[in-house]
């Protein structure tokens, strides 16, 4: 959740600069810092008064994340109406003008947008008219990123640190923290005791 702007409104130069290495998709960072993305992050950045007020009172808890998912839908409905009205005036124009085969140029490009789960980015480089490299960083990659080379934990791990678990054999609190992020994956969390033995496994996600 960048403090000043959404990922989807970055300029092309800034967008291309985000991809630092081949491992960026597994532990992405923004300016070296851990970020979160999703409806709550979007509404906080957009300055939604209700969400900001509730966030100041109680922080980014599970209930507020669920409310933000519903709240953002009301914003999207208004945006869709505006978009459809604009498209209606240009419905006879082509959506894309393809280049003649063989005239493709070498280059790099990036496409950034806000998907249902948050910031989504696609990066591509073209050489000799063919794809040379392609990379995608999904919203879940931002939120679920593992510790980086500096030892900084990702957003999910930071969210779980210090969460009390009443029953280690039925750690519902872990699910309550992660599921409101709407993870686009299936992950299994292994709980180890002090002796390093697996005590419990929890399957999360879709």
Predicted regions and their residues:
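Metal/cofactor-centered catalytic core regions of large enzymes
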Residues: 1-206
